[in-house]
């Protein structure tokens, strides 16, 4: 009987131990689950609030390399429409646009990109110095006029006397079928004032054609570019004079070499700075008087010279055919 009682007691104690282990296991699981759930909940909240960041082992190295800035991050533009470029991007733009301008000079996008990629800061700063040293140049920089069909009032210019700058200008536009509205806004030159100086040069280009009478055919463009380079110093003008003739016929190169290069260099170097001319305020001025004041002589009529050349070649062919 005593033995039976002891066995019963052991059985009861075993049941109690089993329940106790079960309770402890359940309690431990509950506490651990609550802890993990709470931790996951906190992590989820941090992720949602943007407070959780992935640890980058290269972070310290990247901060030293890029001075705390992400690579290739664009800096703040200097003016509306400005696209800041890294130096390597400027080099790539120069290489691409120079090749494009050489093989496809009729494509304005290559000419525009080449002009801005070569308009280096020291050249533009020198032009700014010239403008600041001249009362008219200072006025232009202060007022920053822009040339459009509306601002120039082409209808009014057509009503001016034939000997005026304005009438010569609008006649040249009509004859060559061009418009002042086609000039593209500067985008890739840093510094707002330097960008305006280049924009001013770009918009005045047609006036240089008008006062010299040179057409927009490639020979005329090259002659004007040499004239601009000698007077203003824009690098693209010099590059155009150097490489553009390589694609011309021998007769065209001969005309440039014997007539238009000497004229452009002489008149560009010894005339007054064209960048300081406030064209909008002298449209009613006599064009011959203006040329005399600036020290500019008109070159021979290029279109007439071409006509005479082709007429001569045609006559030679006819004479050879009659033999």
Curated annotation (Swiss-Prot):
Its main location: mitochondrion. Pfam families: Coq4 (PF05019). It comes from the Eukaryota. InterPro entries: Coq4, Coq4_euk. It is a peripheral membrane protein. This protein may be expected to contain an N-terminal transit peptide but none has been predicted. This is Ubiquinone biosynthesis protein COQ4, mitochondrial. It comes from Candida albicans (strain SC5314 / ATCC MYA-2876). The gene is COQ4.
């Amino acid at each position: 009987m005593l033995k039976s009682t002891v066995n019963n007691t052991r059985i009861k104690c075993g049941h109690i131990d089993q329940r106790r282990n079960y309770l402890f296991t359940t309690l431990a699981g509950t506490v651990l689950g609550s802890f993990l759930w709470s931790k996951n909940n906190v992590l989820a909240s941090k992720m949602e609030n943007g407070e959780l960041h992935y640890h980058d082992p290269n972070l310290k190295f990247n901060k030293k390399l890029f001075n705390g800035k992400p690579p290739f991050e664009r800096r703040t533009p200097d003016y509306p429409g400005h696209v800041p470029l890294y130096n390597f991007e400027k080099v790539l733009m120069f290489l691409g646009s120079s090749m494009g301008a050489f093989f496809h000079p009729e494509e304005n996008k290559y000419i525009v990109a080449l002009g801005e990629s070569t308009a280096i800061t020291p050249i533009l700063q020198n032009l700014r110095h010239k403008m600041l040293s001249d009362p008219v140049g200072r006025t232009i920089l202060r007022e920053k006029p822009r040339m459009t069909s509306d601002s120039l009032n082409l209808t009014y210019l057509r009503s001016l006397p034939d000997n005026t700058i304005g009438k010569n200008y609008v006649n040249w536009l009509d004859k060559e079928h061009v418009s002042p509205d086609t000039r593209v806004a500067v985008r890739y030159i840093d510094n707002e004032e330097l960008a305006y100086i280049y924009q001013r040069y770009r918009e005045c280009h047609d006036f240089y054609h008008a006062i010299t009478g040179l057409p927009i055919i490639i020979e005329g463009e090259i002659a004007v570019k040499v004239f601009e380079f000698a007077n203003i110093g824009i690098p693209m003008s010099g590059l155009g004079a150097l490489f553009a003739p390589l694609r011309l016929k021998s007769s065209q190169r001969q005309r440039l070499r014997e007539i238009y290069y000497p004229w452009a260099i002489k008149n560009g170097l010894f005339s007054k700075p064209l960048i300081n001319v406030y064209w909008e305020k002298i449209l009613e001025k006599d064009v011959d008087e203006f040329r005399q004041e600036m020290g500019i002589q008109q070159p021979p009529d290029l279109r007439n010279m071409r006509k005479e050349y082709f007429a001569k070649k045609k006559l030679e062919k006819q004479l050879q055919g009659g033999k």
